[in-house]
Amino acid sequence: MAHKKAAGSSRNGRDSESKRLGVKRFGGQFVKAGNILVRQRGTEFHPGENVGCGRDHTLFAKQDGFVKFNVGGPLNRRTVSIVAAE
């Protein structure tokens, strides 16, 4: 009874689906109200003027205008604002 021992099966071969995070609209770009500006985990970017923050920390435009990124304040926070189009 010539046997061949069963080969071991690999326990690898899994990976999570990418979440497509990151900046979606860049500085100087024109956006409409409701457009998503940044998808993030936690507040890497903070909401500034005319920008809202969703419950998953997604930043979105509250009105039409141009995107502006700033760094400043006492904690050197990165903020995203919307400058109204004149």
From Swiss-Prot:
<dbReference type="InterPro" id="IPR001684">
    <property type="entry name" value="Ribosomal_bL27"/>
</dbReference>
<dbReference type="GO" id="GO:0003735">
    <property type="term" value="F:structural constituent of ribosome"/>
</dbReference>
<dbReference type="InterPro" id="IPR018261">
    <property type="entry name" value="Ribosomal_bL27_CS"/>
</dbReference>
<feature type="region of interest" description="Disordered">
    <location>
        <begin position="1"/>
        <end position="21"/>
    </location>
</feature>
<dbReference type="Pfam" id="PF01016">
    <property type="entry name" value="Ribosomal_L27"/>
</dbReference>
<dbReference type="GO" id="GO:0006412">
    <property type="term" value="P:translation"/>
</dbReference>
<keyword id="KW-0687">Ribonucleoprotein</keyword>
<dbReference type="GO" id="GO:0022625">
    <property type="term" value="C:cytosolic large ribosomal subunit"/>
</dbReference>
<keyword id="KW-0689">Ribosomal protein</keyword>
<protein>
    <recommendedName>
        <fullName>Large ribosomal subunit protein bL27</fullName>
    </recommendedName>
</protein>
<comment type="similarity">
    <text>Belongs to the bacterial ribosomal protein bL27 family.</text>
</comment>
